[in-house]
């Protein structure tokens, strides 16, 4: 079958032919319709330090997708041929304390689709049926293809009560923008997103944020004054992984504020811990999606009117995958969707 693979330990992704994956007793086989390019895929393309330590070569990559069930393992129940599905990209062990306690997103033995085992940039993907999620009929293939990153946004945003709260989102990548949109949709008062990338700040404006702030040109304190905020932000969502951005977020938080951190710093990060201690801040780390509460909430949010379509800015047939990666690497894109139809 046709697949996009990391074939060499150097920059790039290559189209190749690989054997069709084998179906296990507890697996389903998915014929891929659409895939989306994740920032992780860009790291793998660039062959950065993390990728060199993590990704086996050769490897079929990709983990954002939607497709149709075409084969079902003999032990599988609850799925039928023809079901439209996406799937949780974190495959868990089922026997560690967190898995047995129902906290599977915290499994200490997680294996990543398209990271540690063959991924979805291929005509067919096999995953455990446990990981598959049926897509409701009124959700499009394009939106279903970005459920993985949307889930990161939903998990982060819904970590805390948002109704009537003032929220600062640090980092206007696609996940940060979607998180900001979720905050507005569920009833936050002011949702401010901060970045230095004007293209992505414009995308955030299209998604309905209260203010999109280019922090290279504007001061967050001035924005807070403009919005009539007499105290700091109640909720902070750190989506950038940039140490200066996190320090700025800490400076802007109200006493007793709550922070959810999804962005991954490139190395050890120093902060002024006095901000955390004397403000009584609560900081929660976010990894992936809650299985499968986040998935049900994603579907419900879209069905209740949350419009994510502006975040999908580029669409290419799979044979033009290089243009998709070029768009992602340029920093002037939202989500990029590749069609396998």
Swiss-Prot record:
NAD(+) binds at residues 175, 195, 200, 262-264, 286-287. Its cofactor is Zn(2+). Binds 2 Zn(2+) ions per subunit. Its EC number is 1.1.1.103. One of its GO terms (biological process) is L-threonine catabolic process to glycine. GO terms for cellular component: cytoplasm. It catalyses: L-threonine + NAD(+) = (2S)-2-amino-3-oxobutanoate + NADH + H(+). Its main location: cytoplasm. The active site is at 40 (charge relay system), 43 (charge relay system). GO terms for molecular function: L-threonine 3-dehydrogenase activity; zinc ion binding. The keyword Zinc applies. HAMAP family: Thr_dehydrog. Catalyzes the NAD(+)-dependent oxidation of L-threonine to 2-amino-3-ketobutyrate. This is L-threonine 3-dehydrogenase. The gene is tdh.
């Amino acid at each position: 079958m046709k697949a996009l693979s990391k074939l060499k330990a150097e920059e790039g992704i290559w189209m190749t032919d690989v054997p069709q994956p084998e179906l296990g007793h507890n697996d389903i086989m998915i014929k891929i319709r659409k895939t989306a390019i994740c920032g992780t895929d860009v790291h793998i393309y660039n062959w950065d330090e993390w990728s060199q330590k993590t990704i086996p070569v050769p490897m079929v990559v990709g983990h954002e997708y939607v497709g149709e069930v075409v084969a079902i393992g003999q032990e599988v129940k609850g799925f039928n041929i023809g079901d439209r599905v996406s799937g949780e990209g974190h495959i868990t062990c089922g026997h560690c304390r967190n898995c047995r306690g129902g906290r599977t997103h915290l499994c200490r033995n997680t294996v990543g689709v398209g990271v540690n085992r063959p991924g979805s940039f291929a005509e067919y993907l096999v995953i455990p049926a446990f990981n598959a999620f049926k897509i409701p009929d009124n959700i499009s293939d394009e939106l279903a293809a970005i459920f993985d990153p949307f889930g990161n946004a939903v998990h982060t945003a819904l970590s805390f009560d948002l109704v009537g709260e003032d929220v600062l989102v640090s980092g206007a990548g696609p996940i940060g923008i979607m998180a900001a949109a979720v905050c507005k949709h569920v009833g936050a008062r002011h949702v401010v997103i901060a970045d230095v990338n004007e293209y992505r700040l414009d995308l955030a404006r299209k998604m309905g944020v209260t203010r999109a702030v280019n922090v290279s040109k504007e001061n967050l304190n001035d924005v807070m004054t403009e919005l009539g905020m007499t105290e700091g932000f109640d909720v902070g969502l750190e989506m950038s992984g940039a140490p200066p951005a996190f320090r700025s977020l800490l400076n802007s938080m109200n006493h007793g504020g709550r922070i959810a951190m999804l962005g991954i710093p490139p190395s050890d990060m120093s902060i002024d811990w006095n901000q955390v201690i004397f403000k009584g801040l609560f900081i929660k780390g976010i990894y992936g999606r809650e299985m499968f509460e986040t998935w049900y909430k994603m579907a419900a949010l879209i069905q209740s009117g949350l419009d994510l379509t502006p975040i999908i800015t580029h669409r290419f047939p799979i044979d033009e995958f290089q243009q998709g990666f070029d768009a992602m690497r340029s920093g002037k894109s939202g989500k990029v969707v590749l069609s396998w139809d």
